[in-house]
């Protein structure tokens, strides 16, 4: 846009008056001095200060920035030259950027409409692509050997605010037709780079493609951000003509010409805590049932799975990340995988994480590729230059990645996330680009067993079918089984029926996991933090007593609690907790080495030791403590033992003690109740997580599973399909540390026959 000299001078005087008056009590004059001292060439002006000085000027800068960018630059350059005449070379000027509140002009890429073209806007989003930094010629110098004269020429494109655009062709002859030689060393260039900015994933409209806007940055703004960074960019929104000259199609490409780039905190959309919120958080952290309370508050529409819900709470809280002086990075994020039969609410748990976690990105195994999860090098359609494009895990930096149907992913694509899950970085070395991007995220995956349904006669490792190199990167691996028990099925059906009958006063359906479930918390910041008891929703048979009427937090308060504990509490290990962790890890290693019943779901490696530390730290965060105590380690071991041995166990010593007690009780009272013994925090609300033991023969669920595993391994190893009961009894007692009585063997075989897994006739057991 061409502006007459009088208007330019008037605009320049307005900015000089602003700098002279300096409403910030010397702030801008000091900023100019610092800029001159540090050899920088950009001054950032706050819009609030400009409004306080001259409201009309601030409005005109936003509405028609093309008229004011160069006068503002000239004014600042004049002030800088007065401070230091040698600061700027001939033809150089100080660039100006803007910051502060922009009102309606603070938008996301989805809100950028044609009405904003030609105005200054502040756009917030996440960087998805970055081009290489290229030089752009500003002034070319040519020498004529015939006349001995130098000829210079300036170049301006559509992105320039100074004058009209010029051609981009180098002159080869002067006005008299003499040949010219370009003096490249005397030419002037400036750096430029193209970014692609996309709206943040958590604010994307469901069912719609995310919107993207191209951003052009120049000079000192290049390389100020990388893919995966959340940024706020202030610039002028412009429409550029198409590549073909003389195009009359009316379709233009829009870009944002940036003058200020600010990196946003990952928690830019953090909730606001009131004094009452902090008081209630401390009250909840002091309760003895804090762990159960948060677990029950997560996904209340899902029946049971209390231990898995507890693990998800710890995953969202995470441990403490450590970066040592020698460059070693110790991750604090927790990775978790669920493997089990279909229709056991694995995917629903992932959706619950999407609703609660501040930043969560969902993907599927079949719909994702290795480069789509990590990063890719792509080619620009117009210029053909290479670009680095961030994948889902880079975009979810400091968040959670939910991967459903993990077993459907190709092996090559699955290997691509090995580095992310342990080192938490994505390293790219292809097409001449070598880069390392941060991907500090937790991974929660759901998968089906290799045979579709879980085969209890096989070991967990054979059912899962994934390599140990990948399994060891998961801190927790849960086996979720669909058990056929009439009592459990009745309770689940009642729970599902209550959800379908639960309606609002006007007859509409009410959401259980979203804000509708916490509607009493919407209108008042000091509203109750617990979900109001509803007879239709919660039922009448409440096994956990009267207090269970208020045993679920509202979704809004649960988000606040998790965000506060995750980001503002950084616990450290105490000596007592460290000793207990070392002892427990040694016992876990010893137990896995001596296991004869197929072992657990995960190999016990050095990564398991770090898992215990991360889980203990997450539990300390949940209790809002700044130190990790022995009780936190014990709670972490309960979750870890349940994940490894899929039983509600406490410490391994207590598990062995219970086996001895049940064995002694069986000798004295054949009809006594055995079953499974509740560990810390076990709940009658959680039947799907625990195999139901026998009440008649006093055989624990663990011994039943160990028996079935021994029988399955023996049958597969010897390629036989039938055995006598005497042979089975001798075999299991030979392989097991605790012997089985004849009545216990017959009872377990009858259970297997009822499940159509074996057929017994005349003392011979045939494997089906």
From Swiss-Prot:
<feature type="compositionally biased region" description="Basic and acidic residues">
    <location>
        <begin position="661"/>
        <end position="670"/>
    </location>
</feature>
<feature type="region of interest" description="Disordered">
    <location>
        <begin position="661"/>
        <end position="690"/>
    </location>
</feature>
<dbReference type="GO" id="GO:0006271">
    <property type="term" value="P:DNA strand elongation involved in DNA replication"/>
</dbReference>
<feature type="compositionally biased region" description="Gly residues">
    <location>
        <begin position="672"/>
        <end position="682"/>
    </location>
</feature>
<dbReference type="GO" id="GO:0003697">
    <property type="term" value="F:single-stranded DNA binding"/>
</dbReference>
<dbReference type="Pfam" id="PF17855">
    <property type="entry name" value="MCM_lid"/>
</dbReference>
<protein>
    <recommendedName>
        <fullName>DNA replication licensing factor MCM3 homolog 3</fullName>
        <ecNumber>3.6.4.12</ecNumber>
    </recommendedName>
</protein>
<dbReference type="InterPro" id="IPR031327">
    <property type="entry name" value="MCM"/>
</dbReference>
<keyword id="KW-0539">Nucleus</keyword>
<keyword id="KW-0238">DNA-binding</keyword>
<feature type="short sequence motif" description="Arginine finger">
    <location>
        <begin position="472"/>
        <end position="475"/>
    </location>
</feature>
<dbReference type="GO" id="GO:0042555">
    <property type="term" value="C:MCM complex"/>
</dbReference>
<dbReference type="InterPro" id="IPR012340">
    <property type="entry name" value="NA-bd_OB-fold"/>
</dbReference>
<dbReference type="InterPro" id="IPR003593">
    <property type="entry name" value="AAA+_ATPase"/>
</dbReference>
<dbReference type="Pfam" id="PF14551">
    <property type="entry name" value="MCM_N"/>
</dbReference>
<dbReference type="InterPro" id="IPR033762">
    <property type="entry name" value="MCM_OB"/>
</dbReference>
<dbReference type="GO" id="GO:0004386">
    <property type="term" value="F:helicase activity"/>
</dbReference>
<feature type="domain" description="MCM">
    <location>
        <begin position="290"/>
        <end position="497"/>
    </location>
</feature>
<dbReference type="GO" id="GO:0000727">
    <property type="term" value="P:double-strand break repair via break-induced replication"/>
</dbReference>
<dbReference type="InterPro" id="IPR027417">
    <property type="entry name" value="P-loop_NTPase"/>
</dbReference>
<comment type="function">
    <text>Acts as a factor that allows the DNA to undergo a single round of replication per cell cycle. Required for DNA replication and cell proliferation. May act as a component of the MCM complex which is the putative replicative helicase of the replication licensing system in eukaryotic cells.</text>
</comment>
<feature type="binding site">
    <location>
        <begin position="340"/>
        <end position="347"/>
    </location>
    <ligand>
        <name>ATP</name>
    </ligand>
</feature>
<keyword id="KW-0347">Helicase</keyword>
<keyword id="KW-0378">Hydrolase</keyword>
<dbReference type="InterPro" id="IPR008046">
    <property type="entry name" value="Mcm3"/>
</dbReference>
<dbReference type="GO" id="GO:1902975">
    <property type="term" value="P:mitotic DNA replication initiation"/>
</dbReference>
<dbReference type="InterPro" id="IPR041562">
    <property type="entry name" value="MCM_lid"/>
</dbReference>
<dbReference type="InterPro" id="IPR001208">
    <property type="entry name" value="MCM_dom"/>
</dbReference>
<dbReference type="Pfam" id="PF17207">
    <property type="entry name" value="MCM_OB"/>
</dbReference>
<keyword id="KW-0547">Nucleotide-binding</keyword>
<dbReference type="InterPro" id="IPR027925">
    <property type="entry name" value="MCM_N"/>
</dbReference>
<dbReference type="Pfam" id="PF00493">
    <property type="entry name" value="MCM"/>
</dbReference>
<dbReference type="InterPro" id="IPR018525">
    <property type="entry name" value="MCM_CS"/>
</dbReference>
<keyword id="KW-0131">Cell cycle</keyword>
<dbReference type="GO" id="GO:0005524">
    <property type="term" value="F:ATP binding"/>
</dbReference>
<dbReference type="Pfam" id="PF23191">
    <property type="entry name" value="WH_MCM3_C"/>
</dbReference>
<keyword id="KW-0235">DNA replication</keyword>
<dbReference type="InterPro" id="IPR056575">
    <property type="entry name" value="WH_MCM3_C"/>
</dbReference>
<keyword id="KW-0067">ATP-binding</keyword>
<comment type="similarity">
    <text>Belongs to the MCM family.</text>
</comment>
<dbReference type="GO" id="GO:0005634">
    <property type="term" value="C:nucleus"/>
</dbReference>
<dbReference type="GO" id="GO:0016887">
    <property type="term" value="F:ATP hydrolysis activity"/>
</dbReference>
